[in-house]
A protein has these predicted regions:
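Gly/Ser-rich oxyanion-binding loop with an adjacent helix/lid
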Residues: 1-94
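C-terminal nucleotide
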Residues: 74-182
Length: 182
């Protein structure tokens, strides 16, 4: 097939331009050759594979899932092969808010090594506790042993773990607030 694509998403801006393109191609192929049988989650997973292998970017699945599923969603990646996706209905306009996307002027196109370091460092923290991924580490145990973890894995790995725990808590709180109209 031939396709001409035009986008206003700035490449390398952190707005998931590659994920949006991967999902677009996945949806086209799904419609042309699979009769729409491929799920949004599978299209996202295929897009992640393309991101990792073709583009050489060590991305997770979040950007592709957001592009593929669409709308405001909560995604639990505890099982990356079977993520739990929950649509979050919230009418920003009805509440007097507007959700905006801005161009920060920052380009992250050359940060591949930094992105690749994230899962490595988070897995190092998990390994300290005998786990494979940070999701399986008890947060209270992490904080009880943070000094030892820091000696073994380094400052940046500890900061990433703290960020991981804080973000997971924040997201759950925000989803609850949106559902409650708060």
């Amino acid at each position: 097939f031939e396709a001409k694509v035009r986008s206003t998403v700035l490449p390398g801006s952190g707005l998931s331009s590659s994920a949006a393109f991967e999902v677009l191609i996945g949806r086209i192929l799904n419609g042309l050759f699979a009769g729409g049988a491929v799920s949004a989650i599978e299209i996202a997973q295929i897009g992640q594979y393309a991101e990792n292998v073709y583009y050489g970017k060590p991305s997770g699945l979040m950007d592709q899932m957001a592009s593929s599923v669409g709308g405001l969603v909560y995604i639990d990646f505890a099982d990356p092969k079977n993520p739990i996706v929950e649509k979050v209905d919230y009418d920003f306009a009805h509440s007097g808010y507007t959700l905006c996307t801005i161009d920060s002027g920052a380009d992250h196109a050359d940060l591949t090594d930094e992105y690749a370091a994230m899962p490595v460092e988070m897995k190092a923290v998990a390994a300290f506790f005998g786990k494979e991924v940070l999701h399986d580490v008890d947060e209270a145990a992490f904080y009880r042993h943070v000094a030892e973890v820091r000696k073994v894995t380094g400052d940046r790995a500890v900061l990433r773990a703290i960020h991981f725990f804080n973000e997971n808590r924040r997201v759950k709180s925000q989803v609850r607030a949106l559902k409650d109209g708060d």
